[in-house]
């Protein structure tokens, strides 16, 4: 780091804080991305395995990882971890299976469906994270949570959640399941989340299509406190149009009572 300019050193420090990565990884990633901090950070979160030093994977004990998998594998099907194994996995991590941390791990494992991991998902996911023990995985969780502060990575996580949560073979996501996952992933991110849930339970009562799920994130990031910037002529799903129509009088009523 001594050979770097002061501006580059600042970027290395910022990169390390934001990504929770090592100095070597920071220098490697920034130098490959013309020292553009935003580009380097974005690329790191999209493909961390390209930048994290091979020593992380080199120090991985494959036998130890295999033994860890065997602790959780389904007794009836050795190629997957079933619901009991997932519960044990969460207990070992001291995590609630319904917590966002477990969902983030599933995202990093690229899990296809909830309540199970295939052997490949578990082994590849742990290898990519450089983990061969529960202790190492625990230490990675704050870094994964930090990763979601980058909007592009959160969007990827959010869109993953739809496919993960729905029943295989179904196009839409059951309403109750959609609301449960929205409460998990959009809590603190969508100012109208409670009102949205109320609207769905009172007026929709049907499954949620993928495009509505995906576009709700865009809606949540752009909508003003009074919804005055909503464009009815925009390419929004009908459900979001109907929600705005439902919500505006309630928002106006709330404001008038607080004045």
Curated annotation (Swiss-Prot):
Gene3D superfamilies in UniProt: Cullin, PONY binding domain, DNA helicase RuvA subunit, C-terminal domain, EF-hand
Pfam family, one: UBA_4
Residues covered by the UBA-like domain: 8-45
Domain named DCUN1: residues: 60-248
Mutagenesis / variant outcome for changing residue 45 to A: Loss of ubiquitin binding
Tissue: Expressed in pancreas, kidney, placenta, brain and heart. Weakly or not expressed in liver, skeletal muscle and lung. Strongly overexpressed in thyroid tumors, bronchioloalveolar carcinomas, and malignant tissues of squamous cell carcinoma of the oral tongue. Not overexpressed in aggressive adrenocortical carcinomas.
Database matches in PROSITE patterns: DCUN1
Keywords (A to Z) from UniProt: Acetylation, Cytoplasm, Nucleus, Proto-oncogene, Ubl conjugation, Ubl conjugation pathway
GO molecular function, one term: cullin family protein binding
Acetylation keyword on record: yes
InterPro entries assigned to the protein according to its UniProt record, in alphabetical order: DCN-prot (IPR014764), DCN1-like_PONY (IPR042460), PONY_dom (IPR005176), UBA-like_sf (IPR009060)
Top-level taxon in the UniProt lineage: Eukaryota
Essential for interaction with UBE2M (site feature) positions: 115
GO biological process: positive regulation of protein neddylation; protein neddylation; regulation of protein neddylation; regulation of protein ubiquitination
Reported impact of residue 16 to A: Loss of ubiquitin binding
GO terms for cellular component: cytoplasm; cytosol; nucleoplasm; nucleus; ubiquitin ligase complex
Outcome (variant: residue 241 to N): Loss of binding to CAND1 and CUL-RBX1 complex but retains binding to UBE2M
Post-translational modification: Mono- and poly-ubiquitinated by ARIH2 and ARIH1. Monoubiquitination by ARIH2 is mediated by an interaction between autoubiquitinated ARIH2 and the UBA-like domain. The monoubiquitinated form preferentially interacts with non-neddylated cullins and modulates cullin RING ligase (CRL) complex composition and activity.
Modified residues (N-acetylmethionine): 1
Subcellular location: Nucleus; Cytoplasm
Subunit architecture: Part of an E3 complex for neddylation composed of cullins, RBX1, UBE2M and CAND1. Interacts (via the DCUN1 domain) with the unneddylated cullins: interacts with CUL1, CUL2, CUL3, CUL4A, CUL4B and CUL5; these interactions promote the cullin neddylation and the identity of the cullin dictates the affinity of the interaction. Binds neddylated CUL1. Interacts (via the C-terminus 50 AA) directly with RBX1. Interacts (via DCUN1 domain) with the N-terminally acetylated form of UBE2M and UBE2F. Interacts preferentially with UBE2M-NEDD8 thioester (via N-terminus 1-26 AA) than with free UBE2M.
Record comment regarding domains: The DCUN1 domain, also known as PONY domain, mediates the interaction with different cullins. The DCUN1 domain mediates the interaction with the N-terminally acetylated NEDD8-conjugating E2s enzyme leading to the NEDD8 transfer from N-terminally acetylated NEDD8-conjugating E2s enzyme to different cullin C-terminal domain-RBX complexes; the neddylation efficiency correlates with the DCUN1D1-cullin and DCUN1D1-E2 interaction affinities. The UBA-like domain mediates interaction with autoubiquitylated ARIH2 leading to ubiquitin ligation to DCUN1D1.
Described purpose of this protein according to its UniProt entry: Part of an E3 ubiquitin ligase complex for neddylation. Promotes neddylation of cullin components of E3 cullin-RING ubiquitin ligase complexes. Acts by binding to cullin-RBX1 complexes in the cytoplasm and promoting their nuclear translocation, enhancing recruitment of E2-NEDD8 (UBE2M-NEDD8) thioester to the complex, and optimizing the orientation of proteins in the complex to allow efficient transfer of NEDD8 from the E2 to the cullin substrates. Involved in the release of inhibitory effets of CAND1 on cullin-RING ligase E3 complex assembly and activity.
Name listed for the protein in its UniProt record: DCN1-like protein 1
Protein's organism: Homo sapiens
């Amino acid at each position: 780091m001594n050979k770097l300019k002061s501006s580059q050193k600042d970027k290395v420090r910022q990169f390390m804080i934001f990504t929770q990565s090592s100095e070597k990884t920071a220098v490697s990633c920034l130098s490959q991305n013309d020292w553009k901090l935003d580009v380097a950070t974005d690329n790191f979160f999209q493909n961390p395995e390209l930048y994290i030093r091979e020593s992380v994977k080199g120090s991985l004990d494959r036998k130890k990882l295999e033994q860890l998998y065997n602790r959780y594998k389904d007794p009836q099907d050795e190629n997957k971890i079933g619901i009991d194994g997932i519960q044990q996995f969460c207990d070992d991590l001291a995590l609630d299976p319904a917590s966002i941390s477990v969902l983030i791990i599933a995202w990093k494992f690229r899990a296809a469906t909830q309540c199970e991991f295939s052997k490949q998902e578990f082994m590849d996911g742990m290898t990519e994270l450089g983990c061969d023990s529960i202790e190492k995985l625990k230490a990675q969780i704050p870094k994964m949570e930090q990763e979601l502060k980058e909007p592009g990575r959160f969007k990827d996580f959010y869109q993953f959640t739809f496919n993960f949560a729905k029943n295989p073979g179904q196009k839409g996501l059951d309403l109750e399941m959609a609301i449960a996952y929205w409460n998990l992933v959009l809590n603190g991110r969508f100012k109208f989340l409670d009102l949205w849930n109320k609207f769905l339970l009172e007026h929709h009562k049907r499954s949620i299509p993928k495009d509505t799920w995906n576009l709700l994130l865009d809606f949540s990031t752009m909508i003003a406190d009074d919804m005055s910037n909503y464009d009815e002529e925009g390419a929004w799903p009908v459900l979001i149009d109907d929600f705005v129509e439902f919500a505006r009088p309630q928002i106006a009523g709330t404001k008038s009572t607080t004045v």
